[in-house]
């Protein structure tokens, strides 16, 4: 009985430890205005994702599980490109 309790405790600990490691990850998905991710077709190095990440104020990006990922993307820049588009649209509305 003690062995089962120990095994369950160890399994739960590894599960919680794994989840906490994911939260520390320095890679994040850049997002559109509607909170959707940028799709990509080729996993690994991807010029399209590199460009998207540069537009979101970070230098490195790649494709992972068919979505663009940016390394060291701050929370402020997750939707950075959308904010620029919104600002431009507002200015155009004022002009027109």
Curated annotation (Swiss-Prot):
Domain note: Has the structural arrangement of an alpha-helix connected to antiparallel beta-sheets by disulfide bonds (CS-alpha/beta).
Entry similarity comment: Belongs to the long (3 C-C) scorpion toxin superfamily.
Keywords: Disulfide bond, Neurotoxin, Secreted, Signal, Toxin
Signal peptide from the UniProt entry: 1-26
Record-level GO cellular component terms: extracellular region
MF annotations from Gene Ontology: sodium channel inhibitor activity; toxin activity
PROSITE patterns on file: LCN_CSAB (PS51863)
Organism: Lychas mucronatus
Higher taxonomy: Eukaryota, Metazoa, Ecdysozoa, Arthropoda, Chelicerata
Tissue expression profile of the protein: Expressed by the venom gland.
Presence of keyword Lipid metabolism: no
Location(s), subcellular: Secreted
Protein origin, superkingdom: Eukaryota
Protein known as: Neurotoxin 67.1
């Amino acid at each position: 009985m003690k062995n089962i309790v120990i095994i369950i405790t160890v399994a739960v600990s590894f599960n919680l430890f794994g989840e906490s490691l994911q939260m520390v990850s320095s890679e994040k998905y850049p997002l559109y205005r509607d909170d959707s991710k940028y799709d990509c077709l080729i996993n690994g190095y991807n010029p399209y994702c590199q460009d998207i990440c540069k537009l979101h104020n970070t230098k490195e990006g790649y494709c992972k599980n068919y979505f663009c990922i940016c390394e060291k993307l701050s929370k402020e820049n997750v939707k950075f490109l959308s904010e620029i588009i919104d600002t431009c649209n507002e200015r155009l509305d004022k002009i027109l």
